[in-house]
């Protein structure tokens, strides 16, 4: 099992979590391939972090699963923009911490019905 962590990336955690939920439990090679064709800044960042996690463990991407993919909120950079009549309004520039954990395994993301059957003990 290997991990990769990218901290203080200028990316909204809310938007990044949408992509992170999609790749959790996927094969690493398939996840990287699908992220490359996703037109989103978060997809580019997550693709690099997944590739880094695979490289950190000296693993083969074809036989590696993404065990967990977590995006936490980092500090918010506060900026101001001038407005009419001498006022200024705040601009929030959020940052994120991206954490990816991968492990050897060949099982793909299982379906909801399969998970339900496992929970019931069938």
From Swiss-Prot:
Similarity annotation: Belongs to the universal ribosomal protein uL22 family.
Molecular function, one GO term: structural constituent of ribosome
Highest taxon of the lineage: Bacteria
GO annotations of cellular component type: cytosolic large ribosomal subunit
GO BP term, pick one: translation
Pfam families: Ribosomal_L22
SUPFAM superfamilies reported in the protein's UniProt record: Ribosomal protein L22
InterPro entries, per database record: Ribosomal_uL22, Ribosomal_uL22_bac/chlpt-type, Ribosomal_uL22_bac/org-type, Ribosomal_uL22_CS, Ribosomal_uL22_sf
Keyword Transcription regulation: no
Originating species: Helicobacter pylori (strain G27)
Residue span of region Disordered: 102-122
Record's keyword annotation contains rRNA-binding: yes
Complex and partners: Part of the 50S ribosomal subunit.
Keywords: Ribonucleoprotein, Ribosomal protein, RNA-binding, rRNA-binding
Gene assigned in the entry: rplV
Protein name, entry field: Large ribosomal subunit protein uL22
Function of the molecule: This protein binds specifically to 23S rRNA; its binding is stimulated by other ribosomal proteins, e.g. L4, L17, and L20. It is important during the early stages of 50S assembly. It makes multiple contacts with different domains of the 23S rRNA in the assembled 50S subunit and ribosome. The globular domain of the protein is located near the polypeptide exit tunnel on the outside of the subunit, while an extended beta-hairpin is found that lines the wall of the exit tunnel in the center of the 70S ribosome.
